[in-house]
Design a protein with these regions (language model features):
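Acidic, low-complexity, intrinsically disordered peripheral segments
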Residues: 22-24, 402-430
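Positively charged n-region of N-terminal signal peptides that target proteins for export
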Residues: 1-4
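Sec/SRP-type N-terminal targeting helices
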Residues: 46-50, 63, 97-127, 178, ...
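Bacterial N-terminal signal peptides
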Residues: 7-15
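Bacterial Sec-pathway N-terminal export signals of envelope proteins
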Residues: 19-69, 74, 96, 174-178, ...
Length: 430
């Protein structure tokens, strides 16, 4: 009978503890679906999009001529002139800035709108990373809960076998009722851990739903197993090419270049062209020397007006300010590029470190599985103690926790690289 129980315990140990390496994907990985949902529903991303649209409207409204001016003068009492009496004057005047001023204005507004677009992109991409961060943290907690439940079941099986051994006539010298009490105390620790992790999982699910901007108790479809993601072939050129922060700084630099050109154009003269039409009545008493044929004749008068930008202090200050902004933006671009490259190099090292840790914990878990099988046999034979079994179970739980944390960390490192190359960029779908 003891051999039968020993065989059952070994089989249960193998099935339960090696189940952590078994993949069961009855539910689809819906992470991509949740990322899209967050991008569409998140208020911060929506706010950035509306800000971008507002700047696009500003760009469309700029770069056009000012409205023409219409003037109308009516004389209740006709004004005597040399060739008649003036009763009405109508004039139209159109202002024209210096050549290229309107184009520079529109270019500046368009580049500012592009900078706002890149800022909106960056917010959406950062949100997708936050979704993945909470997703993998939640999966790691689910894995830890599964491991603890499995180990608790194993502990209960050991307890039942020990109880039978204690009551049977085949009880060995090492069989003690105190071991049953120690197992019950250990089981209470397991129950507390399970309750604690369940509370953490509940809070993480609520936070995840709030991140998606939906009711906090909404159902979340999670895969059954947390699997390590394959590390991509990392290229710095992809980061430099696609990162929205760098593109935003480039757009800002182009906007300040256009602003400098605009300041220069404002320092040039502007002019206005117009025409004036005068309505005259005949003068019954024309002045001496007046031409009779022109008495009471209406007249057209072309007009031109030119501004003289003689006060240069404002223009020079605006141009200098634009030059300083260009210099500051270029330095910010180099600083951001260096920071991203530093992050890129560190990311490669962290991925290698995470993969080594996963391999280490997998190896240790396999060894501890075999150790537990041997300890159970030795305990029944009286050559090992319950302390050894409990200590090995604690080490097993600790290694399983570390492995799940390392797998989640590796997945997050991959997600961080995807964030740097803007993989989850849904701006084109808006």
């Amino acid at each position: 009978m003891i051999r039968y129980l020993l065989g059952c315990m070994a089989m249960i140990t193998t099935c339960l503890l090696k189940a952590t390496a078994t993949t069961n994907t009855s539910q689809p990985d819906s992470l991509a679906h949740y990322i899209i949902m967050a991008a569409k529903n998140n208020p911060e991303v929506a706010s950035g999009y509306h800000k971008y649209q507002a700047m696009v409207m500003n760009a469309e409204a700029s770069g056009v001529l000012p409205n023409p001016e219409l003037s109308l003068s009516v004389y209740p009492k006709p004004m005597p002139q040399e060739n008649g009496r003036q009763v009405l004057t109508v004039g139209v005047m159109q202002m024209f800035p210096w050549f290229g001023t309107l184009k520079a204005t529109r270019t500046m507004k368009e580049k500012q709108a592009n900078a706002a677009f890149q800022q909106w992109r960056e917010a959406g991409i950062a949100l997708s990373y936050t979704v993945q961060q909470q997703w993998y943290t939640l999966l790691a907690k689910e894995e830890q809960l599964k491991y603890i439940v499995q180990n608790r079941q194993l502990l209960n099986n050991i307890k039942q076998a020990m109880l039978y051994q204690y009551k049977s006539s085949l009880a060995t010298k090492g069989s003690k009722m105190s071991d049953q009490l120690r197992i019950e105390a250990e089981d209470a620790v397991y129950q507390e851990k399970i309750a604690s992790i369940q509370d953490e999982i509940k809070a993480l699910k609520q936070q995840f739903n709030l991140l998606l901007h939906r009711p906090e108790n909404s159902f979340i479809a999670l895969p059954d197993t947390l699997l390590a993601r394959e590390t991509p072939f990392m290229q710095w050129q992809e980061v430099q090419k696609n990162h929205p922060a760098l593109e935003q700084l480039e757009a800002q630099n182009e906007a300040f270049v256009a602003q400098k050109e605009l300041a220069q154009r404002k320092g040039m003269p502007s002019f206005a062209l117009g025409v004036e039409y005068m309505v005259n009545q005949k003068n019954p008493h024309p002045l001496s020397g007046a031409m009779p044929d022109m008495n009471g004749m209406d007249m057209f008068m072309p007009m031109m007006k030119v501004s003289l930008p003689i006060y240069r202090k404002k223009v020079n200050a605006e141009r200098k300010a634009a030059e300083l902004q260009i210099q500051a933006t270029q330095e910010a671009y180099l600083r951001k590029k260096d920071a991203l490259q530093t992050e890129f190099v560190a990311l490669q090292q962290q991925m290698s470190d995470a993969k080594r840790k996963i391999e280490l914990y997998n190896h240790q878990i396999t060894l501890l599985n075999n150790t537990l099988n041997l300890l159970q046999t030795e305990y029944i034979n009286g050559s090992s103690s319950l302390t050894d079994i409990l200590q090995t179970l604690r080490e097993q739980i600790d290694n399983e926790r570390k492995r799940s944390d390392s797998v989640a960390a590796l997945c997050l490192l991959v997600a961080q690289y995807e964030k740097m190359i803007s993989k989850y960029d849904y701006s084109s779908q808006q």
